[in-house]
């Protein structure tokens, strides 16, 4: 009974020369029959399942490659779009800077022109006022000379009296101007 429960001592006791040819033959026949049954009934579905699995894996790989290529294409398009947007923004900023500079120069030139026109107008008015003032002064001088001459003629005075009269008249001049 101990030998049935423990297979190791039995094999060790019999050795390699104790191979049973009948058992080996039946084992081989059973293996071949099972192989034939499996080949007939199971091999086709197994091969078909493996082929289907291989096809689905291949399709998944192809799909992944296509999706990767599409993602790379979209990434390149996105980079190009971003680059284009950056170029357009830089161009817009450059144009705006040029427009601002042109407007600044235009406004500066306009302000300078207006200032020059105001200065010219002021000079013209000053010149007119100067001409008017000279004309008024000339008229006053003429009036004074006529007045002085008429007083001299009326007084018909000697030289000393004439000198005193002119000095008195000159002393009255600031009073005449203020009035």
Swiss-Prot record:
Q: Which Pfam families match?
A: ATP-synt_B
The UniProt record lists the keyword Chaperone: no
InterPro entries to which the protein is assigned, alphabetical: ATP_synth_b/b'su_bac/chlpt, ATP_synth_F0_bsu_bac, ATP_synthase_B_chain
| Entry keywords, A to Z | ATP synthesis, Cell inner membrane, Cell membrane, CF(0), Hydrogen ion transport, Ion transport, Membrane, Transmembrane, Transmembrane helix, Transport
Q: Which residues cross the membrane?
A: 27-47
Might you report a single GO cellular component term?
proton-transporting ATP synthase complex
According to its UniProt entry, the function of this protein is described as: F(1)F(0) ATP synthase produces ATP from ADP in the presence of a proton or sodium gradient. F-type ATPases consist of two structural domains, F(1) containing the extramembraneous catalytic core and F(0) containing the membrane proton channel, linked together by a central stalk and a peripheral stalk. During catalysis, ATP synthesis in the catalytic domain of F(1) is coupled via a rotary mechanism of the central stalk subunits to proton translocation.
What's this protein's family per the entry?
Answer: Belongs to the ATPase B chain family.
In Swiss-Prot or TrEMBL terms, this protein is called ATP synthase subunit b
